[in-house]
């Protein structure tokens, strides 16, 4: 059995595989983040009470989504009542398609293209995360999928890609990230939300909410037009309307 107070001065995990997944409320297949060739070194793992130095330092080297080299530096203080932490990292040579295993189940979108480099430097606590995010990318495009059929909505995809910055500038643009934690979710969900917001701001501009509102309005208009078109056809052939689509 584990005895307290607990202190592990040095912990190494080598050449392991780590999978993080979140269940969907509708019971569908969960999205997954995978980390292969996972190597971790943690120093000063402690249970807080009885120790002067309570800061934990963790270094990670792995392959994100099994393909992209990734390194992370993470530190936190077990004595801090707000669960303050800092975390920074870098991902290189990431095919955008590889993140669809996690993105698609939640957003009904697919991404394609090349993400050459991602850098993030965040700090946070039990309620929020914030910091800087930079990314170099090329030929990135988004496919919007129908929630039921999973087929691409080509018109909506085309509208979305008018907004997406397909290629990064010659000098990598830095965006500032700030997002809050879902209290029912883990630290890793909060970290992903920070990375996700950085991804959005890089691809569609810093005013993400305004851009998403614009796309939503276009989607509603397209949905209305589809509904009208479907109504007009029965009217001509049968002389009555049927509302086939719900929005």
What is each stretch, according to the model?
Residues 21, 68, 97, 128, ...:
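Residue-level signal for secondary-structure boundary sites
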Residues 1-19, 89-124:
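Extended amphipathic, helix-rich lipid-handling scaffolds
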Residues 77, 90, 106-247:
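Extended terminal
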Residues 2, 20, 54-56, 69, ...:
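Generic, low-specificity signal for short hydrophobic/alpha-helical stretches with a mild N-terminal bias
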Residues 1-87, 95:
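Elongated, acidic membrane-bridging lipid-handling scaffolds
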């Amino acid at each position: 059995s584990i005895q307290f107070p607990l202190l592990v001065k040095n912990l190494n995990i080598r050449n392991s595989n780590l999978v993080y997944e979140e269940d969907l409320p509708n019971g569908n297949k969960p999205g997954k983040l995978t980390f292969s060739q996972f190597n971790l070194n943690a120093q000063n793992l402690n249970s807080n009470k009885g120790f002067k130095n309570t800061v934990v330092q963790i270094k990670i080297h792995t392959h994100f989504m099994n393909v992209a080299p990734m390194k992370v530096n993470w530190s936190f203080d077990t004595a801090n009542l707000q669960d303050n932490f800092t975390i920074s990292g870098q991902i290189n040579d990431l095919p955008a398609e590889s993140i669809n295993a996690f993105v698609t189940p939640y957003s009904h979108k697919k991404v394609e293209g090349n993400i050459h480099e991602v850098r993030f430097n965040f700090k946070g606590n039990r309620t929020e995360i914030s910091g800087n995010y930079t990314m170099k990318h090329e030929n990135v495009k988004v496919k919007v999928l129908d929630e039921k059929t999973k087929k691409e909505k080509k018109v909506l995809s085309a509208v979305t890609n008018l907004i997406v910055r397909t290629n990064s500038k010659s000098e990598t643009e830095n965006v500032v990230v700030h997002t809050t934690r879902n209290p029912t979710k883990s630290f890793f969900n909060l970290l992903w939300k920070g990375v996700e917001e950085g991804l959005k701001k890089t691809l569609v501009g810093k005013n993400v909410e305004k851009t998403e509102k614009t796309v939503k309005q276009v989607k509603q208009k397209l949905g209305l037009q589809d509904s009208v078109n479907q109504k007009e056809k029965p009217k001509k052939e049968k002389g009555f309307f049927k509302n086939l689509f719900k929005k």
